[in-house]
């Protein structure tokens, strides 16, 4: 997110410094060649005086004076101040042979008035050199203190062109401890700063060596019309982004019970970050807020914030915009990681994100905080009038590259990796396991793959645009600085040309940043926020708002409710103790157990449950199913661990073997069952009455399901007193306790000796049921079972 950058270079010259250029390197060329630049012919005496001044002064009459011919003053005013004496000499001015020429040079030097602090200290020096007091053929020499006072405030003169030889603080021209008449003159020290510089007394606002002047608050590289155009652009896209992200947040909150699921809820936090960021961008449109944010109290641009003597409005806007942006991009990485891991766990009961959500929050909120504190510590927050905000690296693009481009580039690499892996996982599930997917699940996978592809394309495109715009700024910033420098010098020409009646040039900035590039850069930032909000632009969102409206207005919602079978079974098992006391009660399901799709409906896969519809017959038999699954057991039945043998002392060890019955075996068993039924109708075999077990007493406990009328798989084995269970040999036999004559033995069942029977009837030959697993095995082998 780059905004317009002012062309601030390390070498912006003083506006009035062009005076030195117009002088033709004043003092140097004149002193070395002996040629004057003033108008009119030079007298031989004037040339001799200049030559004497340069080659070496004659022996001084005293420590603070030098012999020189005096001439009456033709101009009794020097730089706007009246001189208290009436005679002067041109001996000390190495670039002037006459008073007229010296007066013209002073006019050119007056361009330094645009550097207020330099102008305040250089006026006495210039008057003491160009129009010194001369009395009795003796000229006063300026003191060394007067010369040294100009070196600091006027450092830009030394840096740009260098001081002339006759203005260098040498002991022969500027002796120590001398008083000068000029030092008693009161000069007008109220200098001014030429546009685009403004006057300021705050040293932190001074621009480089131009003490007393700072860059104006409004970016000088753009016109007022361009400022207004950019502000309207930011207002439009900022408002659209804010409204889209706000709608997303409201949709999540309206159905928070179903929306608060990972990974979909991560989109809530991403949109929250971009919503807060858009608020930071739109804050400038409050009355007077933009100037308060990007401008200092002295009218200069905010640079190097935070500072102790300025308000915190700039820092607050920076924290809002930058922290929200960095948190949003980190949440994007977490989102792609959550998608990747969730897609890998499809079709299983494994919850890959369980226990990791706290680490997600720790990472996404702490990392941007560290970056924000680091930027504030190095004081690299700058304001920009075009964008209307404060951000990092407007002045120094290296900090912008390190704190903006580097994190975004890392996000692009890591997030892109997880996003591509997630799409590949979905494609693998769809192509390698087509028979395991219901039509609804396959449709969701296709929709999600398409949306992830579009989303990834937009994310990569926006990041690429951001990088391109920033590189455009980096590579052209030096050229913009040179163009701005020429513009400043041109403005100085206008200032000097007015009093000297020289031609006035037409000043304009030749090379400057493109406003279109700045708009494209901002579009990438706002477009990312809009793209994040599109995940809730689904039909499920319309249903959420419909239910919310009905709830708020008290209207009835005629939408058919869907309750997942898994939720009904879980609730039935949770109420098994109540069903034990009252087997006839019916289960009621409140609206809180009704499951709706969240706003991000495309990410809710359920490969194991192709349909969520529940028939009335299925719902009525939930309690029966609970009993058949062993959740409700009679109080007189003992429950022991699975596969724990409890054989009677006088019988062989028998127990049911858990096994999976293939469909072919079930068909065979069904046919055998039918044959046994037909045989019973012809010749029923009644068991002896003495072998019947006693009738159970009346009880409210629901009856256990009847065991199937078919052969059971029994493991039989015998061992001696010294043998252990593991040393014995086990064989699978058919249950010999059925009264019917057994048909020919199946080839897949081995033969074994039959143990002694103890009962007759449908449950004859079976030992006591010792565990819930036995109940479930019995149910599994029942061909008439619905579950």
Swiss-Prot record:
Domain of life, source organism: Eukaryota
Alphabetical list of InterPro entries matching this protein: Frizzled/SFRP, Frizzled/Smoothened_7TM, Frizzled_dom, Frizzled_dom_sf, GPCR_2-like_7TM, SMO_7TM, SMO_CRD
Entry keyword set: Cell membrane, Cell projection, Developmental protein, Disease variant, Disulfide bond, G-protein coupled receptor, Glycoprotein, Membrane, Phosphoprotein, Receptor, Signal, Transducer, Transmembrane, Transmembrane helix
Cytoplasmic membrane side: 255-262, 336-358, 424-451, 546-787
Region Disordered, annotated ranges: 30-60, 667-704
Region (Interaction with DLG5): 581-593
Localization in the cell: Cell membrane; Cell projection, Cilium
Glycosylation (residues): 35, 188, 309
Gene3D superfamilies assigned to the protein according to its UniProt record, in alphabetical order: Frizzled cysteine-rich domain (1.10.2000.10), Rhodopsin 7-helix transmembrane proteins (1.20.1070.10)
GO cellular component terms, semicolon-separated: 9+0 non-motile cilium; centriole; ciliary membrane; ciliary tip; cilium; dendrite; endocytic vesicle membrane; endoplasmic reticulum
Binding residue positions for cholesterol: 95, 394
Modified residues (Phosphoserine): 556, 574, 590, 595, 638, 662
Post-translational modification: Phosphorylation by GRK kinases is required for interaction with protein kinase A catalytic subunit PRKACA.
Signal sequence bounds: 1-27
Region (Interaction with BBS5 and BBS7): 538-569
Biased composition (Low complexity): 38-53
TM helices/strands, residue ranges: 234-254, 263-283, 315-335, 359-379, 403-423, 452-472, 525-545
Summary of the function given for this chain in its UniProt record: G protein-coupled receptor which associates with the patched protein (PTCH) to transduce hedgehog protein signaling. Binding of sonic hedgehog (SHH) to its receptor patched prevents inhibition of smoothened (SMO) by patched. When active, SMO binds to and sequesters protein kinase A catalytic subunit PRKACA at the cell membrane, preventing PRKACA-mediated phosphorylation of GLI transcription factors which releases the GLI proteins from PRKACA-mediated inhibition and allows for transcriptional activation of hedgehog pathway target genes.
Notes concerning its domains: The N-terminal extracellular domain mediates sterol-binding which is required for maximal activation of signaling. Contains a second sterol-binding site within the seven-transmembrane pocket which is also required for activation. The activating sterol is likely to be cholesterol. The extracellular site is required for SHH-induced activity while the site within the transmembrane pocket regulates basal signaling in the absence of SHH.
Family statement: Belongs to the G-protein coupled receptor Fz/Smo family.
Name of the featured protein: Protein smoothened
Organism encoding this protein: Homo sapiens (Human)
Organism phylogeny: Eukaryota, Metazoa, Chordata, Craniata, Vertebrata
Designated gene of the protein: SMO
